[in-house]
A protein has these predicted regions:
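Cytosolic ligand/metal-binding cores
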Residues: 93
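Catalytic cores of DNA base-excision repair glycosylases
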Residues: 142-144
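Short beta-strand
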Residues: 147, 166-167
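Short catalytic/ligand-gating loop segments at beta-alpha or beta-beta junctions
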Residues: 147-152, 176
C-alpha cells in the first residue's frame, strides 16, 4: 500500500504505518494525479486559516495558508475517489472544514487547560472520553476510554456527512467518521501512543491504525 502524508517531517506516522508494510510519501505539494496512492493521512500541525471556514481571526495562530490549500485540496480529491483518509488533530479539523464544518478557534478557559499542549514541558493532557455504543470505534476501544490531548482548537459545526462517534468528558468532539466514505477524523494523537510508545491506561493507537490499514487493503 502507498500512503500520501500531507506534510513533511512526520516520523511517528511513518513508523505507525510501517507496521503494515506501507510505503509513505511526504509532501506539501499537490500532485498532478493521486492514482498511485491508496490512502491519505492528514497529520497534526498548526492552525487552519479561518478564511477557509468563513471566519475572522479569533484565537488562531501559526497559520500556514499554503499548506492548508494543499491539505484541503487533497482531502477533496481523495474523498471524490472514495479513497481512505485519516485525519489526526489538525487533520481532523481539515476534514471537518472540507465538508463544510467550522472550527472553535480557541477553546475557552478551563477547557483549554484540559486539552492543550504545554509548550514549556512538551507534554499534553489526558482525559476521559465517551464513545457511541455499537459504533466501530466502540468495538475497538469500548464505550469509555482515556485519550491524550494536544490541541487548543476544536471542531465546531460538524461537516456534512460526518458523524460524531466520540466526545471528551467536557463535550469536545474527539472522533468523527463519514457516514458513507472511509474517512476518519480523530482529534487525539494515536501515533503518539502505540506499540512501543503505548502508555498504560491510555487509548493505544494500534487498533485504529490496524482498522485504517484494513480499509486501505480492502480498497474502501
Amino acid at each position: 500500500m502507498k500512503v500520501l502524508i500531507a506534510n513533511l517531517d512526520t516520523p511517528n506516522y511513518i513508523k505507525a504505518m510501517s507496521h503494515f508494510g506501507a510505503e509513505c510519501v511526504n509532501t506539501r505539494e499537490i500532485p498532478e494525479s493521486i492514482e498511485e496512492y491508496d490512502a491519505l493521512i492528514l497529520p497534526g500541525g498548526d492552525d487552519i486559516d479561518p478564511v477557509f471556514f468563513h471566519q475572522e481571526m479569533n484565537g488562531s495562530r501559526d497559520i500556514d495558508h499554503e499548506l492548508d490549500v494543499t491539505q484541503l485540496t487533497l482531502c477533496r480529491r481523495f474523498a471524490e475517489e472514495g479513497k481512505p483518509i485519516l485525519g489526526i488533530c489538525k487533520g481532523a479539523q481539515v476534514i471537518n472544514v472540507c465538508f463544510g464544518g467550522d472550527i472553535i478557534q480557541d477553546l475557552p478557559d478551563g477547557k483549554r487547560e484540559h486539552h492543550s499542549y504545554h509548550q514549556g514541558r512538551g507534554t499534553g493532557e489526558y482525559h476521559e472520553t465517551d464513545i457511541v455504543p455499537g459504533s466501530f470505534l466502540a468495538k475497538l476501544y469500548g464505550e469509555h476510554v482515556v485519550t491524550n490531548s494536544y490541541h487548543h482548537q476544536a471542531i465546531g459545526k460538524v461537516g456534512e456527512g460526518l458523524e460524531v462517534l466520540q466526545k471528551s468528558d467536557d463535550g469536545v468532539i474527539e472522533f468523527m467518521a463519514h457516514r458513507s466514505l472511509p474517512i476518519y477524523a480523530v482529534q487525539w494523537h494515536p501515533e503518539k501512543n502505540c506499540w512501543d510508545t503505548a502508555k498504560e491506561g491510555v487509548a493505544d493507537g494500534e487498533p485504529l491504525f490496524t482498522y485504517f490499514a484494513e480499509k486501505i487493503r480492502n480498497g474502501k
